[in-house]
Amino acid sequence: MNAPALSPARRTKKLPPLRVGIGGPVGSGKTTLLEMLCKAMRERYDLVAITNDIYTKEDQRLLTVAGALPEERIMGVETGGCPHTAIREDASINLEAVDRMLSRFPDADIVFIESGGDNLAATFSPELSDLTIYVIDVAGGEKIPRKGGPGITKSDLLVINKTDLAPLVGANLDVMASDTKKMRGERPYVMTNLKALEGVADVVAFIEKKGLLMV
């Protein structure tokens, strides 16, 4: 039996919750970004998080162990198939997860939804996500921005993570920045070293400004 959807009468805040989708390839730093965002924003905003894995709930466990949010505010979804499908073509499993979390926490300000690791073609359904953040990492090589794909060209914010690894993999950050601007036009991007918290404040500021949380 499906969990009940959020009842509008239970929500006391005027604005609906902001749904932020976080996507990107396996190992790019999606879960780390989600952890850092939760820790940076939890004192000011009411947060819940939903993670996607194909056959496990490992990302949910990692966030819980890291103390990103209280355990009851983190839900793991086992998609059992292509992670792209679960956030785009048939997002019903995630839409139901959002409803379940909002039935528990009706005054949530932000619902973070982390996709399972996927390729550069992954995008979020507009029914599921209001803002999309796509994470790639320098370890994949400086060519990654040039490869394009909806995640790189159409996401609301592109995060280029693991900048500290550039010297180790022979990647030129200036080239990556230039290619990113060519591929994205005026759409913003942030270079980060999430383990050192570098760039996290910029991502938070983007969410607050673009999501109108500061109004």
From Swiss-Prot:
GO biological process, one term: urea catabolic process
Keyword hit for Chaperone: yes
Highest taxon in the source lineage: Bacteria
Single GO molecular function: GTPase activity
Known partners and oligomeric status: Homodimer. UreD, UreF and UreG form a complex that acts as a GTP-hydrolysis-dependent molecular chaperone, activating the urease apoprotein by helping to assemble the nickel containing metallocenter of UreC. The UreE protein probably delivers the nickel.
Alphabetically ordered keywords of this record: Chaperone, Cytoplasm, GTP-binding, Nickel insertion, Nucleotide-binding
Function comment: Facilitates the functional incorporation of the urease nickel metallocenter. This process requires GTP hydrolysis, probably effectuated by UreG.
The organism's taxonomic lineage, starting at the top: Bacteria, Pseudomonadati, Pseudomonadota, Betaproteobacteria, Burkholderiales
Family: Belongs to the SIMIBI class G3E GTPase family. UreG subfamily.
NCBIfam families membership: ureG (TIGR00101)
Protein name, as recorded: Urease accessory protein UreG
Binding residue positions for GTP: 24-31
InterPro entries per UniProt: CobW/HypB/UreG_nucleotide-bd, P-loop_NTPase, UreG
Keyword DNA repair among record annotations: no
Subcellular location: Cytoplasm
A Pfam short name: cobW
Gene Ontology cellular component list: cytoplasm
Alphabetical list of HAMAP family matching this protein: UreG
Chief location: cytoplasm
